[in-house]
A protein has these predicted regions:
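Amphipathic alpha-helical segments that line or abut small-molecule/effector binding pockets
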Residues: 15-18, 132, 136
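Hydrophobic ligand-binding cavity/cleft-lining segments
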Residues: 1-40, 46
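Hydrophobic beta-strand positions in extracellular immunoglobulin-like domains
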Residues: 10, 55, 107-109
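Beta-strand/loop substructures that line and gate deep hydrophobic ligand-binding cavities in soluble
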Residues: 80-133
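Glycine-rich portal/gate segments that line the openings of hydrophobic small-molecule binding cavities
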Residues: 38-84, 97-102, 133-144
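Generic recognition of short, well-ordered alpha-helical interface segments
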Residues: 12, 29, 63, 129-133
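Short, surface-exposed coil-to-beta transition loops
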Residues: 3-5, 61-65, 86-91
Length: 144
């Protein structure tokens, strides 16, 4: 199992940060590696919502569909892949820190298979860099 965990403090109230980060319409706005993202069914910040998306990583297009399986309004959510090149679970948590909000992105993915398994450390490093960059972009947008 491969794990990426990144955190950032955004100087905005927790509810505003959570609403921005978990709104499916905003994902392509702050995620430079996401080339397509659409709400397929359900409500955007409700359990059962399903989104289809395409991410570009290490020069490859990876198609995914995930379902929001847990939500605690203003605090966090959990997403589980339904159909993905690399199966994963993702948890996003928001907590108060002083006048701002700490956002923690925790994602667990299956290892690449077969011949490509040796690329796991490289893919993990590239993806962690994308997550850090995306959280930084969300911070810039929200604080401007």
């Amino acid at each position: 199992m491969l794990t990426v965990e990144e955190s950032i403090v955004i100087n905005k109230p927790r509810l505003a940060v959570w609403e921005f980060i978990t709104d499916s319409a905003n994902v392509p706005v702050y995620s430079s590696n996401v080339v397509e993202y659409e709400l397929v069914s359900g409500e955007k910040q409700e359990v059962g919502r399903i989104c289809r998306w395409v991410v570009k990583m290490a020069g490859r297009r990876l198609e995914m569909t995930d379902e929001m399986t847990e939500v605690e309004r203003g605090r966090g959510g959990k997403y589980v892949s339904k159909d993905a090149t690399i199966p994963y679970t993702l948890s996003v948590h928001c907590q108060d820190v002083g006048e701002g909000t700490k956002v923690t992105w925790h994602q667990e993915m299956e290892s690449l298979k077969g011949f490509f398994k040796s690329a796991d450390p490289i893919v993990l490093k590239l993806y962690a860099r994308d997550v850090r960059s995306n959280l930084g972009k969300a911070k810039t947008i929200l604080e401007s």
